[in-house]
Amino acid sequence: MIEVEIDKDSGFCFGVVTAIESAERELGNTDTLYCLGDIVHNSLEVERLEHMGLHTIDHEGLSRLRDRKVLLRAHGEPPSTYALAKRNNITIIDATCPVVLRLQRKIHKCYQETRANNTQLVIYGKKGHAEVNGLVGQTEGTAIVIEKIEDLDRLDFTRAISLFSQTTKSLDGFKAVVAEIKQRMAEGVEFNYYDTICRQVANRLPNIKAFASSHDWVYFVAGRKSSNGKMLFEECRKANPNTLFISEVSEITEPLPEGVRRVGVCGATSTPKWLMEEVAVRIKELNASE
């Protein structure tokens, strides 16, 4: 008999929940609401909201809008987006995650205080990611984005450095970057670093590893665009090599291998609970005779 368990700690983080609730609330009062970028990196959840009247646009689309309501998702936006909205008489529904908002303010304050002494502001994050674009915008585009240790060659270790992190990055990865910078800094040169990783995200790492290792087989459910999903999946697979990444229920087409009894279903901070529940139902259907 197959036993299927959904990880109670997986699913939307509070920032994503707030953004989706904001969209649903607005769509309850209007037929059309625009969202700048995918509200969440999960295509099925985006489709659900689009059926309610949500229209996803990019920055070019925003520049053409006038006199409309636009939702800013949890990832946050640079100051230039707010300036454009004001010029175009766009009403902003700001669903920026409070953790991201605090980080934006912290980086902006650091930039204002250190720009005169030529300090390098460095962000450990994914280049081009919406959150990172918003953070870089707080420095008038001057921040240096570091994705991996090898990128540190771009820094000048004879000049002061202030290091921040994208909120959804790996804590271990951040610690490794800090250690490497410390080792390379010229003697007497100032290096300040700030652990700005969201603990709701960071705490999922040990939890999801424990969850994965306690099952014979794991389905990790996430959107292909989710950075958090990719990171958590890799950790899941390290803990349990029998971990499969899926984005939709339709990807489960075969019964489980013989001998599998305990199956886990987990996901990213952008994975809706309803999708994990559908995956669990599908697993039971395909393995009903096992």
Curated annotation (Swiss-Prot):
The active site is at E131. GO terms for biological process: dimethylallyl diphosphate biosynthetic process; isopentenyl diphosphate biosynthetic process, methylerythritol 4-phosphate pathway; terpenoid biosynthetic process. It comes from the Bacteria. Pathway: Isoprenoid biosynthesis; dimethylallyl diphosphate biosynthesis; dimethylallyl diphosphate from (2E)-4-hydroxy-3-methylbutenyl diphosphate: step 1/1; Isoprenoid biosynthesis; isopentenyl diphosphate biosynthesis via DXP pathway; isopentenyl diphosphate from 1-deoxy-D-xylulose 5-phosphate: step 6/6. Gene3D superfamilies: 3.40.50.11270, 4-hydroxy-3-methylbut-2-enyl diphosphate reductase, catalytic domain (3.40.1010.20). Its cofactor is [4Fe-4S] cluster. Its EC number is 1.17.7.4. GO terms for molecular function: 4 iron, 4 sulfur cluster binding; 4-hydroxy-3-methylbut-2-enyl diphosphate reductase activity; metal ion binding. NCBIfam families: ispH_lytB, PRK01045.1-1. This is 4-hydroxy-3-methylbut-2-enyl diphosphate reductase. It comes from Parabacteroides distasonis (strain ATCC 8503 / DSM 20701 / CIP 104284 / JCM 5825 / NCTC 11152).
